[in-house]
Amino acid sequence: MKAIKLTGHERPLTQVKYNKEGDLLFSCSKDSSASVWYSLNGERLGTLDGHTGTIWSIDVDCFTKYCVTGSADYSIKLWDVSNGQCVATWKSPVPVKRVEFSPCGNYFLAILDNVMKNPGSINIYEIERDSATHELTKVSEEPIHKIITHEGLDAATVAGWSTKGKYIIAGHKDGKISKYDVSNNYEYVDSIDLHEKSISDMQFSPDLTYFITSSRDTNSFLVDVSTLQVLKKYETDCPLNTAVITPLKEFIILGGGQEAKDVTTTSANEGKFEARFYHKIFEEEIGRVQGHFGPLNTVAISPQGTSYASGGEDGFIRLHHFEKSYFDFKYDVEKAAEAKEHMQEAN
């Protein structure tokens, strides 16, 4: 599986994200600029310039009309994807660690860090659009709601929306997961103890009914949205920064590696700077993809399940298009089940 190396960022990557159609890849880094790339060949379409500090997070709406960024410069910006212009800016009292659009694209959440006496919160912003063109008509100048860190929880590090935007799920610095009911004024529903260390990433399944987490405690979990029940556990031998669920195939991809401060004294093999593929059902590692010479900070997979991208501490994005062997891979038990199904159909 040959990688396309995308060079454009000067500092470590913080997040990569595909649009819904999978033809564009969005990336942000600690160099204060975001980039948009063609996912087919890795050509850069343009940059989003305007932040003055690290951009921690980026997301694009379901129409590929607008994308949102959250930065350490105490601001959130909304961008027109077609021309790269900033169309709205929101000021924040603290750095913004994560942003994500709701499934309908009319709202987005932003995680505010718990620093400088700020308790930490998940702020919800509304974007009003033309129903026919999906063009922006009005934005809420202030958050329409603030989910303040619930008692007994540390501040949120990651968050996302479930199916139809019914719930918001958040991962926290103390390794816990919490759940909020959007239709009931974002009321706190429940929380569970999951990781031993801070949750570094959380990404949802294609149907938004379950999600995967990663943590520096070297573990990754698959969790059901409705019950917060742990479905699967994936154990590794290195700190994890990112995790994603693959469409089409029953796989998950994990990424991480040794702490960035120790990278200069460590070889790529010892640092474990690989994307690791696990079977989603059987919880077994099935392969690794090397290439980065630093920890993997972020991994994203195209909604069509035909390619994935990884962003590293080394400042590079590696774009991989899956080959036939990836789609053909099956466990013996999977082959036997398919053969049995074909026999039943024949009879």
UniProtKB/Swiss-Prot annotation:
One of its GO terms (biological process) is translational initiation. It comes from the Eukaryota. The modification Phosphoserine is found at residue 302. The keyword Repeat applies. InterPro entries: eIF3i, WD40/YVTN_repeat-like_dom_sf, WD40_repeat_CS, WD40_repeat_dom_sf, WD40_rpt. One of its GO terms (cellular component) is eukaryotic translation initiation factor 3 complex. Pfam families: EIF3I. Keywords: Cytoplasm, Initiation factor, Phosphoprotein, Protein biosynthesis, Repeat, WD repeat. Gene3D superfamilies: YVTN repeat-like/Quinoprotein amine dehydrogenase (2.130.10.10). It is found in: Cytoplasm. Its main location: cytoplasm. GO terms for molecular function: RNA binding; translation initiation factor activity. Signal peptide: none annotated. Present with 2400 molecules/cell in log phase SD medium. Belongs to the eIF-3 subunit I family. Component of the eukaryotic translation initiation factor 3 (eIF-3) complex, which is involved in protein synthesis of a specialized repertoire of mRNAs and, together with other initiation factors, stimulates binding of mRNA and methionyl-tRNAi to the 40S ribosome. The eIF-3 complex specifically targets and initiates translation of a subset of mRNAs involved in cell proliferation. The eukaryotic translation initiation factor 3 (eIF-3) core complex is composed of TIF32, PRT1, NIP1, TIF34 and TIF35. The factors eIF-1, eIF-2, eIF-3, TIF5/eIF-5 and methionyl-tRNAi form a multifactor complex (MFC) that may bind to the 40S ribosome. This is Eukaryotic translation initiation factor 3 subunit I. The gene is TIF34.
